[in-house]
């Protein structure tokens, strides 16, 4: 029976109504019910942002055909955002890649050749030759990988093992460097451990919400719906929103604050001063659980050492700090008076006071939320530290309804990039490569020679671009990311290195993205439920899903690619003789045998999979690969405050928030009665620090790396929109989402447009010192910049806004500031 969509919907409604009324079902409707019953449903976390919504995935005849919010998922409680409802369509774009493609001319690889289909063996042959040549001629520092906060946990773990242990290169970094690195360093400096202490359950218990550089209405809409429900159902609840431009979150705001870019640092210090001046410090908490330190200043902007701003900095890249007294701290913040703050920020005094009163009121439970406005900031780590100051001064932390909460943008920026440690300086469970004890722990667990993991921090994301351009990094593999579009300063610092004939670039992706088309070799990748996976969301919730369909054609998961490629290398080809002498039994073995097919990883048999359960990688290898990798990885955190539950528990649950101890998850860390690591009588214990105390930092305002001047007279801020996710490589292939927002526009204040003889809908050339793009003027709509600032989303591959942005970073976190550079406009 063939049914039109309209007939299907009508019959479906008839069937539902008849069933509810206890009536017999008409024949057509019975056929629909039969079709519905043929759909197989299973759970998965959403593929998009870091909220971690649970969805039910419907599959039929080997395809994902439906998706709905999971009513049993505690995060979203059955709701999806607009992107979540269209998840099935992200995998079925017309240009889905299904076989490897190599640039070739006259039957062999050529940097200027045309993309030509090849086999996986041919792809690995070329990769093997390029990797081995680079390793032999220039050593491990000449190869690198750029990964993703969209990797599954075991993909990130496998990649980290391959590079740090196998190839002995720490030149592996995730795209989370561009979004969450400042949050990581902020957590580590203040608390000694990464990730939030609270959870989403705080929303229903809070009295006030303060958004710092976070448009949750569009970027975290499900959480925003919970905040909206809390605000509208309780007249005593307050919402404050701070941003450099007006956006949809302002619609709910009781106090909507627009401030001059970079001056959020001033506001944060003003609030600390207000708390002290109004005797609002929680003295009991403060005296027992807090230390005070003064941080180094004038630390530069993470630009090339030859840049004038770096040469002028007194303490470039310094994260040094020294103890200070309370009286000295009080004097430090006293400079940030109401009058000075209003003048520097452009915010009216009454709005500043209203905001400060929320934090100072001992009867108000306050949650601070932030995302990229704080993190993508040349002083992003400082901004994180300064908001923690407010909660530590008042004791509004680690308790229901209270706390600072860094929201994440990718589905596993926490679970993979941060917890697994796929950053160039990190190892699992907050360990770092510079710590000999940490390296020793990993080397012993992985049964590799002592000294295998390099002590030198590898190249971070922006440094990788520079090293490619300079010819120091010659073989570069990117996975699950579209950095040619998403990263900063495309013209000056990225494209030159990618197209340099000295370098060989590999991109693993499901679609021909801007990055893929700039590469030399494209590897087709399995997506989402085409593989078994695990993500970790913003509230420390680890969630699993099973493979539910097979990938099209020859597309393979990132995990398969990493593991199979490791077979191409024997230990003596990648390790020096002095290492092999320490473990001669590893001589002659492949990296596959040493890293993945070990007794530790391969001990879980295929019989642990359900009889009809898809798992392409495990069935090919003969053991349950994902379980082996996860259990080995989870060992690092157990007993150290990062406890993950046993593997099988996650397939039964809708996620669990670590630390999971004795089968119980943790909602609030660091507080007695909530955290199993805090003993009776301790009250609070920030056990990431040796003395159990968190740190309040004295850190000043410092200006942005680039600000408007007479020629480049406007601030440019970049970001996202509700309908698209990051570079749009998935969402722009969903017809409904593409139609809803088909191309990027330049949001501009009407008076700024008028002064330049521009009208809504006009084409306009946006020009910075680094490049130019053509966009379309938008003087109305959802985003309303103040005079002097324009906003442009980065999802549109036809309008590469990152040709304009500056590659200035926070010197401590190495995270790029995408929110502040100077541009001018020219009418087209």
UniProtKB/Swiss-Prot annotation:
Its cofactor is [4Fe-4S] cluster; Mo-bis(molybdopterin guanine dinucleotide). It is found in: Periplasm. Its main location: periplasm. Substrate binds at residue 794. [4Fe-4S] cluster binds at residues 46, 49, 53, 81. Mo-bis(molybdopterin guanine dinucleotide) binds at residues 83, 150, 175, 179, 212-219, 243-247, 262-264, 372, 376, 482, 508-509, 531, 558, 718-727, 802, 819. Residues 1-31 form the signal peptide. Gene3D superfamilies: 2.40.40.20, 3.30.200.210, 3.40.50.740, Dimethylsulfoxide Reductase, domain 2. PROSITE patterns: 4FE4S_MOW_BIS_MGD (PS51669), MOLYBDOPTERIN_PROK_1 (PS00551), TAT (PS51318). It comes from the Bacteria. Its EC number is 1.9.6.1. Predicted to be exported by the Tat system. The position of the signal peptide cleavage has not been experimentally proven. GO terms for biological process: cellular respiration; Mo-molybdopterin cofactor biosynthetic process; nitrate assimilation. Keywords: 4Fe-4S, Electron transport, Iron, Iron-sulfur, Metal-binding, Molybdenum, Nitrate assimilation, Oxidoreductase, Periplasm, Signal, Transport. InterPro entries: Asp_de-COase-like_dom_sf, CT_Nitrate-R-NapA-like, MoPterin_dinucl-bd_dom, Mopterin_OxRdtase, Mopterin_OxRdtase_4Fe-4S_dom, MopterinOxRdtase_cofactor_BS, Periplasm_NO3_reductase_lsu, Prok_molybdopt-oxidoreductase. One of its GO terms (cellular component) is membrane. It catalyses: 2 Fe(II)-[cytochrome] + nitrate + 2 H(+) = 2 Fe(III)-[cytochrome] + nitrite + H2O. One of its GO terms (molecular function) is 4 iron, 4 sulfur cluster binding. Binds 1 [4Fe-4S] cluster. Pfam families: Molybdop_Fe4S4, Molybdopterin, Molydop_binding. Component of the periplasmic nitrate reductase NapAB complex composed of NapA and NapB. Belongs to the prokaryotic molybdopterin-containing oxidoreductase family. NasA/NapA/NarB subfamily. Catalytic subunit of the periplasmic nitrate reductase complex NapAB. Receives electrons from NapB and catalyzes the reduction of nitrate to nitrite. This is Periplasmic nitrate reductase. It comes from Escherichia coli O127:H6 (strain E2348/69 / EPEC). The lineage of its organism: Bacteria, Pseudomonadati, Pseudomonadota, Gammaproteobacteria, Enterobacterales.
């Amino acid at each position: 029976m063939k049914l039109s969509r309209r007939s299907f919907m009508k019959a479906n409604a008839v069937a539902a109504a008849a069933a509810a009324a206890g009536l017999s079902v008409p024949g057509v409707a019975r056929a629909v019910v039969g079709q519905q019953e043929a759909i197989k449903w299973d759970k998965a976390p959403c593929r998009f942002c870091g909220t971690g919504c649970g969805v039910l995935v419907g599959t039929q005849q080997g395809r994902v055909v439906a998706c709905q919010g999971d009513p049993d998922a505690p995060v979203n409680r059955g709701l999806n955002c607009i992107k979540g409802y269209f998840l099935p369509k992200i995998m079925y774009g017309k240009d889905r890649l299904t076989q490897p493609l190599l640039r070739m001319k006259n039957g062999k690889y050529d940097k200027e050749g045309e993309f030509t289909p090849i086999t996986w063996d041919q792809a690995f042959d070329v990769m093997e030759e390029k990797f081995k040549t680079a390793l032999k001629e220039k050593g491990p520092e000449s190869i690198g990988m750029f990964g993703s906060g969209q990797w599954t946990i075991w993909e990130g773990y496998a990649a980290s093992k391959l590079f740090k242990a196998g190839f002995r290169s720490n030149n592996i970094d995730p795209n989370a460097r561009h979004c969450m690195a400042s949050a990581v360093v902020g957590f580590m400096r203040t608390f000694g451990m990464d990730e939030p202490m609270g959870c989403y359950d705080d929303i229903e218990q809070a009295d006030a919400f303060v958004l710092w550089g976070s448009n949750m209405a569009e970027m975290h809409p499900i959480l925003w719906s919970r905040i909206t429900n809390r605000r509208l159902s309780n007249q005593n609840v307050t919402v404050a929103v701070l941003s450099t431009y007006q956006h949809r979150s302002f619609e709910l705001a009781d106090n909507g604050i627009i401030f001059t870019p970079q001056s959020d640092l001033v506001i944060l210090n003003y609030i600390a001063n207000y708390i002290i001046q109004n005797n609002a410090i929680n003295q009991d908490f403060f005296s027992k659980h807090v230390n005070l330190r003064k941080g180094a200043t004038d630390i530069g902007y993470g630009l090339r050492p030859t840049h004038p701003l770096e040469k002028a900095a007194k303490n470039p890249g310094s994260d040094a700090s020294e103890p200070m007294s309370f009286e000295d701290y009080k004097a430090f913040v006293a400079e940030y008076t109401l009058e000075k703050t209003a003048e520097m920020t452009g915010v009216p005094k009454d709005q500043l006071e209203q905001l400060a009163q929320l934090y100072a009121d001992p009867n108000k439970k306050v949650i601070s939320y932030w995302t990229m406005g704080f993190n993508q900031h040349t002083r992003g780590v400082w901004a994180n530290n300064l908001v923690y100051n407010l909660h530590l001064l008042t004791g509004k932390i680690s308790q229901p309804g209270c706390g600072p909460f860094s929201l994440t943008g990718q589905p596993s920026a926490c679970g993979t990039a941060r917890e697994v440690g796929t950053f160039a300086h990190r190892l699992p469970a907050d360990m770092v490569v510079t710590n000999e004890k940490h390296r020793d722990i990993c080397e012993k667990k992985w049964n590799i020679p002592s000294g295998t993991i390099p002590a030198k921090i590898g190249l971070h994301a922006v440094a990788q671009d520079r090293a490619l351009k300079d010819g120091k990094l010659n073989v570069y593999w990117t996975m699950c990311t579209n950095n040619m579009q998403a990263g900063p300063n495309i013209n000056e610092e990225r494209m030159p290195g990618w197209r340099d004939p000295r370098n060989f670039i590999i991109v693993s992706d499901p679609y021909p993205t801007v990055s893929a088309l700039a590469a030399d070799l494209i590897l087709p990748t399995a997506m989402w439920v085409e593989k078994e996976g695990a993500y970790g969301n913003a509230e420390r919730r680890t969630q699993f899903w099973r493979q539910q369909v097979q990938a099209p054609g020859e597309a393979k998961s990132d995990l398969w690619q990493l593991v199979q490629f490791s077979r191409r290398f024997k230990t003596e080809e990648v390790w020096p003789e002095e290492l092999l002498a320490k473990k001669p039994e590893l001589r002659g073995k492949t990296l596959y045998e040493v890293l993945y097919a070990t007794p530790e990883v391969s001990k879980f048999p295929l019989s642990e999979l359900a009889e009809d359960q898809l798992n392409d990688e495990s069935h090919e290898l003969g053991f349950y690969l994902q379980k082996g990798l996860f259990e080995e990885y989870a060992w690092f955190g157990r007993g150290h405050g990062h406890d993950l539950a046993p593997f099988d528990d996650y397939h039964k649950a809708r996620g669990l928030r670590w630390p999971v101890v004795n089968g119980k998850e943790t909602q609030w860390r660091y507080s007695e009665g909530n955290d199993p690591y805090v003993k009776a009588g301790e009250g609070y214990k920030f056990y990431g620090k040796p003395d159990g105390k968190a740190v309040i930092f004295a850190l000043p305002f410092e200006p942005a790396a680039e600000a408007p001047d007479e020629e480049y007279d406007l601030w440019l801020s970049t970001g996202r929109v509700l309908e698209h996710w990051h570079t749009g490589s998935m969402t722009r292939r969903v017809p409904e989402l593409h139609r809803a927002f088909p191309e990027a526009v330049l949001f501009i204040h009407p008076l700024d447009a008028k002064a330049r003889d521009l009208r809504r809908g006009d084409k306009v050339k946006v020009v910075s010192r680094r490049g130019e793009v053509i966009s379309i003027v938008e003087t109305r709509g959802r985003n309303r910049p103040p005079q002097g600032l324009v906003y442009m989303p980065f999802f549109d591959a036809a309008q590469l806004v990152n040709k304009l942005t500056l590659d200035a970073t926070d010197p401590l976190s190495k995270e790029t500031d995408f929110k502040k550079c100077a541009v001018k406009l020219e009418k087209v």
